[in-house]
Amino acid sequence: MPPKIRELISMLESAGFENTGGKGSHRNFKHSQSSTLVTVSGQLGDDAKHYLIKAVKIALENSRNENN
């Protein structure tokens, strides 16, 4: 079962990403110490789409690499 949007947002926030706004069901997250950006779309209780899961994983990896 895919993770919920709420879980992806929690992962981003625990990794140092901050919500920089958005419109409607779209939320933009920027890492506080790097230039990594990711947009999360969907309602909090929705299942995350495969492409969104991949985008979040890439953003988390990029933020780790830029901080090292």
Model-derived features: where do they sit?
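Basic nucleic-acid-binding interfaces
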Residues: 1-21, 30-68
